[in-house]
A protein has these predicted regions:
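Glycine-rich, small/hydroxylated-residue low-complexity segments
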Residues: 23-495
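Gram-negative bacterial Sec-dependent N-terminal signal peptides
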Residues: 1-22
Length: 495
């Protein structure tokens, strides 16, 4: 079936998108395309062919049938209008409804209904202008829908996909191979139920609001392009965001059976390299999932829920020497993860371990100065001198928070870095605060996860390098770094 879908989309693209002559006679050009398709075994018919004074061509009652009726495309009308301003540019429109029929000898007949309101597709380089400095492509539609038209389809049990306020633009600069694009959607609705012979059953009913995508890249596979991003010679970025989303889905395959429903308040992914700086941000807002079935490779879990407030990854750094130390940041945060009792009960039915939310947060910043020679990066990385890669002036712990099973670990502190010794050496202090760890260790012993002897050794080691805190089950340790060595509350640590 995938082959036939590809054939259908290819046929549509070829019928109005393949240049055969460098000329702006769109009427003659379209005749040549139809003739070429006919010579390859396709059957093309239409009730009327209207050629306008503006050079436009409208095919009314359009029907394109591939050899052996494998793919049939039917539309009330298809129209192309050449630009009066940009040579070779053509704008295409389609009747509000069209039907694509795929006759697959293996999976049967699949009927796909395509509906649209205000669909407009504009492409450069159609009848001429293929060598223009910049080629552009755009798609606009108030709405665009794809549904199944065969209630007895053995594969597509249900299909209803809808795009609202679609806007997409792409430009390609031929000399530099610069590819720039932007896509926007007010909403995306997806309802499908697919019974695939090899993959299994895939079903989902969901929607997402306010989808945005933008990118700028050099469209080649030359490894030097990456060096251009890092050196600041070229700007590249990928930015994606989505608003509130919800879905109910099933995945039934030979390896897994998963059924769930979930919601999310939003997602952001951004990667940018510009002017000698690199920044990566990934963030997922409040998310909740409920799994009614979860079985992978014959290992089932009971129905369970999982939720979290935030997942965030943030990394930013200069990549070239701008003449002074500059701030770099690294953050990984998973906040307030809550898992339902049904999962805990699998290994701790007696509730020996506290059911507190899980947090894992590390947020660091540093002042750094990169020294990599991006014209010959191997020389910098293989010199054996860390200073040829870069220098670190200081490091600050903005936040460390780890919680699980009633225990909590926090840390704060900072250190300055001496780069004169042939390797970076820190001088400073980090204060660790550990609370609830005795209760967690006792719980792990109670459920048999760790032996009592090992638990005692671990607690004894911690007490040797920590002092009692304000609470009954709380310990504090000051880790100090100096040229004389590393100590914990004044006790030298083995090096």
């Amino acid at each position: 079936m995938k082959k036939h879908i590809l054939m259908a989309t290819t046929a549509l693209a070829i019928s109005f998108g393949a240049p055969v002559a460098a000329q702006d006679d769109f009427a003659g050009f379209s005749e040549g395309i139809l003739g070429m398709l006919s010579s390859q075994g396709a059957t093309i018919s239409f009730d009327a062919r209207n050629v306008g004074a503006d050079g436009s061509v409208e095919l009314v009652g359009f029907n394109l049938t591939a050899p052996d009726d494998e793919v049939i495309i039917v539309a009330d009308w298809v129209k192309g209008v050449p630009s009066a301003v940009t040579p070779g540019q053509v704008t295409f429109t389609l009747s509000p409804s069209a039907v694509v029929t795929i006759n697959d000898p293996d999976s049967g007949q699949h009927i796909i209904n395509i509906s649209n309101d205000g669909l407009v597709v504009t492409l450069d380089g159609i009848t001429s202008g293929q060598s223009a400095p910049v080629l552009n492509f755009s798609v606009m539609a108030n709405s665009l829908g794809v549904t199944s038209g065969n209630p007895n389809d053995p594969v597509i049990k249900a299909l209803d996909i809808g795009f609202t306020n679609l806007s997409q633009t792409v430009s390609y600069t031929q000399a530099s191979k610069l590819l720039v694009g932007a896509t926007g959607l007010a909403s995306l609705m997806m309802n499908y139920d697919l019974d695939l012979p090899e993959e299994g059953k895939l079903a989902s009913d969901g929607q997402v609001a306010d989808l945005q995508l933008a990118f700028q890249v050099i469209a080649d596979d030359d490894e030097r392009t990456m060096l251009e991003y890092l050196s600041g010679a070229t700007t590249g970025f990928f930015e994606f965001s989505a608003g509130a989303a919800s879905a109910t889905a099933k995945i039934y395959s030979p390896e897994a059976r998963i059924a769930y429903s979930g919601t999310s308040t939003g997602t952001t992914i951004a990667l940018r390299a510009e002017n000698g700086y690199v920044n990566l941000v990934e963030e997922v807002g409040n998310t909740q999932y409920s799994f009614s079935e979860f079985n992978i490779d014959g290992l089932p879990l009971p129905p369970f829920d999982v939720s979290l407030d935030q997942i965030r990854i943030n990394f930013s750094t200069p990549t070239v020497n701008h003449g002074s130390f500059e701030e770099a940041n690294a953050e990984i945060a998973m906040r307030n993860i809550v898992i339902s009792e049904s999962i805990y009960a699998m290994f701790d039915p007696g509730q020996a371990i506290t059911r507190s939310p899980v947090n894992a947060v590390v947020n660091l910043s540093a002042n750094v100065m990169p020294n990599v020679n991006w014209a010959n990066p191997d020389a910098s990385f293989e010199s054996g001198n860390p200073a040829d890669i870069g220098e670190v002036q200081d490091i600050t712990i903005n936040e460390v928070l780890i919680t699980a099973g009633g225990a909590e670990v926090t840390a704060d502190g900072s250190a300055t870095i001496d780069n004169s010794m042939g390797f970076p050496f820190p001088t400073g202090k980090v204060t660790l605060n550990v609370a609830g760890v005795q209760g967690l260790v006792n719980g792990l012993v109670a459920i048999g996860l760790i032996p009592q002897e090992q638990a005692g050794m671990a607690m004894g080691m911690m007490m040797a390098f920590a002092r009692p805190g304000a609470g009954a089950d709380e310990f504090v340790s000051d880790i100090e770094f100096s040229p004389q060595g590393v100590t914990a509350n004044g006790v030298p640590l083995p090096m």
